[in-house]
Amino acid sequence: MASGPIAGGGVSKTKHKWSDSGNKSQKRSKPTVANSNSLGLEDNHQMMKISLSSISKLEVRNLKRKLQAELEEVRSLIKRLEPQGNNFAPVPNKKLKTANGGKKGGVHGAAADKGTVQILKSCNNLLTKLMKHKSGWIFNTPVDVVTLGLHDYHNIIKEPMDLGTVKTRLSKSLYKSPLEFAEDVRLTFNNAMLYNPVGHDVYHMAEILLNLFEEKWVPLETQYELLIRKQQPVRDIDFHAPVSTNTHNVEALPLPAPTPSLSPPPPPKVVENRTLERAESMTNPVKPAVLPVVPEKLVEEASANRDLTFDEKRQLSEDLQDLPYDKLEAVVQIIKKRTPELSQQDDEIELDIDSLDLETLWELFRFVTEYKESLSKKKEEQGLDSERDAESFHNSVHESNTLVTGLESSKVTELGHVASTVRQEVNVGGSSSSNSSSSGSGSGSSGSDSDSSGHESDTGN
């Protein structure tokens, strides 16, 4: 078999030929070296050639050890040359679905999730309200410097911006985050306030819209910050082994001493310690981490930017129909406030819930909710008042009954005393009359005796 170079080692094997007598040849030749200094580093790619058939087994083992040592040196040198942290295999790139349905230039990073897409939709709604405002028409298009004769405009304003440009960028998903959208909106109004003096109509209009934007931007910014906080732990995942932070209950167990194969199980002290630790963990539960408290008002405003469901709209329509006449005027004013064209019509307005914008719907929803809460509070107060009246009436009746009972008992007591007195008097009178009657009868008997004696005397004579 012909010999050839082997990649990485430069060693080739040749099959030893047997002699005609069947005995293995005892002749051994020294290894042939083409060029000891080349080692494949020169341009002609000359490599070391070693005939394994011509060297002994001991020399083969030594050569193998030498090559392995050189290979380890090469590997260690490669590790030193490579930057730290790049020793992992490259992760294959996966195509991420963009937020705008696969179009190029879409929102990436944190905006790829549904939460950020929903916030950007709310930003689009806010931008539409600014552009439809009665003072927003002047900011909807770029400033026409030539037509207006503003020759010094670009000297003062270094970065022009308008709401129409913001609308275009938002529709093409050129904003990486809602914060960039807010910067361009602020830049539009700040440019107008910078170029126009204080007291100018444009300055006043820009100030009004900027204040309106800042007011409506607060819940969106809060919602975006909450979304970023939720995504932050996912980005900072540590792939190292988890380390327990509850170190006060962990005891270092000593290594078991070498014992015979028939050694008894570990002493029960460890079990007792584990039982005590479990009891302590039951009596002293771990307190959860305190999350940052978001103001309730901001959370309510952030939730108010969502669309109303079909059931909520239906319930709102029914509640509006149940409102009394004095509350309908406030409802009309709420609708006219954001729909100026309705103010020119008659007092009767045909209301279509689906035609109202989101902000008007939420304001009507809050108005109806507050009215229902106030109505329930009044009913509760009336119920408490009626209960208090009934209780006071019951107490007064109880007191009057107690008073009457006391009077009756006192009268009964007095009557008892009178009856007992009468009985005593009756008893005394009866005894005296009986005595007198008995004495009378005695006298009568004596009289009869005297009469009888007299009669006898007369008879004797």
Swiss-Prot record:
NET domain location: 298-379
Amino acid composition bias (Basic and acidic residues), ranges on this chain: 376-392, 452-461
Domain named Bromo: residues: 114-220
Annotated SUPFAM superfamilies: Bromodomain
Biased composition (Low complexity): 429-451
Main subcellular localisation: plastid
Recorded GO MF terms: histone binding
Region annotation Disordered: where it falls in the sequence: 1-41, 376-461
Keywords: Bromodomain, Chloroplast, Chromatin regulator, Plastid, Transcription, Transcription regulation, Transit peptide, Ubl conjugation
BP GO annotations: chromatin organization
Post-translational modification: Sumoylated by SIZ1. Sumoylation reduces capacity to bind to acetylated histone H3.
UniProt biased composition (Polar residues): 393-412
Transit peptide stretch: 1-51
Compartmental location: Plastid, Chloroplast
Ranges annotated as biased composition (Gly residues): 1-11
Pfam families: BET (PF17035), Bromodomain (PF00439)
GO CC field: chloroplast
Domains (record comment): The NET domain could serve as an interface to localize different proteins or complexes to chromatin.
Function: Probable transcription factor that binds to acetylated histone H3.
The protein's assembly and partners: Interacts with SIZ1 (via PHD domain).
UniProt name for this protein: Transcription factor GTE3, chloroplastic
